[in-house]
């Protein structure tokens, strides 16, 4: 039995190539009511969690069975894995928090590679208290000669106590910690040549032991 969390691509192996994916951030809100004047009243305030689905390319039958077995492990209680946006092919860089404005969420990073460009749409991840924080840049910047960059912004906002000065971060094609959505794995269908349509849904977890 593997030690969780596992890196999804490493654990599933070289056959785990994307055919299609969704990769999205939940709203954390619900429509509670709509007034006679057409105003939509939204309620909620729950955690905004990343979620998505992954469909793998068609596999030879023996490879599909191997994939099924590994996914069975990931569907069990207590299993978790790291997954990222597979359309992001830019690699990762590391750095540290330099400063964070608690009121606005605007922050600076240090210890980055000079000249590296952080783009809106890149991802930011860091570990704290047994958890993995995962965010997406809405405002980026170019790292200066001293390895510093700011003023940066991300969604969702940092949770209280998570982002602190000197904490190490990963920038770019970073990954979040996730679990399988129960009942949402499709093992695919097979013809004489291959098995296709193997799909599963996942959702970010903030628990240390999901």
Please annotate each region the language model reported.
Residues 1-210:
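Extracellular/virion structural assembly segments
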């Amino acid at each position: 039995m593997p030690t969780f969390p596992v890196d999804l691509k490493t654990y599933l192996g070289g056959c785990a190539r994307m055919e299609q994916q969704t990769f999205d951030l939940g709203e954390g809100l619900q429509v509670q009511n709509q007034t006679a004047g057409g105003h939509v009243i939204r309620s909620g305030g729950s955690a905004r969690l990343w979620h998505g689905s992954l469909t793998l390319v068609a596999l030879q039958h023996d490879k599909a069975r191997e994939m099924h077995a590994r996914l069975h492990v990931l569907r069990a209680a207590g299993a978790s894995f790291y997954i990222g946006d597979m359309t992001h092919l830019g690699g990762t860089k590391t750095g540290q928090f330099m400063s964070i404005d608690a009121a606005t969420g605007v922050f600076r990073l240090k210890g980055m590679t000079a000249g590296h460009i952080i783009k809106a749409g890149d991802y930011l991840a860091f570990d704290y208290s047994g958890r993995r924080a995962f965010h997406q840049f809405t405002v980026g910047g170019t790292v200066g000669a001293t390895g510093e960059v700011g003023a940066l912004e991300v969604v969702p906002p940092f949770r209280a106590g998570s982002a602190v000065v000197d904490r190490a971060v990963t920038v770019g094609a970073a990954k979040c910690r996730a679990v399988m959505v129960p009942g949402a794995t499709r093992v695919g269908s097979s013809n004489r040549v291959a098995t296709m349509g193997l799909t599963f849904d996942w959702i970010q977890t903030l628990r240390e032991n999901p």
